[in-house]
Amino acid sequence: VLSLLTGGGGNANYWHWLFDVLPRLFLAKQVINLEEIDFFLFPSLDQKFQRETLDILGIPIKKRLSSRYYRHIAANKIIITDHPYILKNNPIKEIEDLPLWISEWLKESFLKINNKSEVLSKKFYIDRKDSSSNHTSLRKIINEEELKKFLKSKNFDIISLKSLTFANCVQLFNNAEFIIGLHGAGFANLSFCKPSTKIIEFRITPGKMYENLAKINNLKY
């Protein structure tokens, strides 16, 4: 059994799934053939994006275990990895200093699904109205409707990422030239942007995780 368990964020949060959970597959692959793994233990498999990413990565459904349903397991061998980036027990600092290899692995793994035949927005605002985050009540723009009206006048589309498939999100961000949004997990998709894509993030917290993610990917934040 390969354990991909992580902190609580991996249960449902898009960011933590992409940066805390899935990169463990890359780490494990450095020392073992993943085809030899009998089962992969995940924090959760309830979210659509979780199942979609595993389909793309070729993890067979019959080998996927969710810790929400398998609370205790016994195995002849359990394989675990280090956390992909929290290595010094200082998560607040380390989440702002992400290693480039994670973004590069995400690109390598998921940009291959890009279907360039579809016409997509090049300039868009991320609408969080459908967000299931526990922080939604704390993260909001008081005059958001006024902001949306202004952005529409500048030919920005208003897009809810939750309404898209994972493959659509990858394609959308890879095609984008200008992205605006409120601090949230959707900015994890900055890993899929082309260099020089323009980014404006509204945030009320001091955290620089998305700012630094943009910078290591050579985006204009």
Predicted regions and their residues:
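The feature primarily captures lumenal catalytic ectodomains
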Residues: V1-Y221
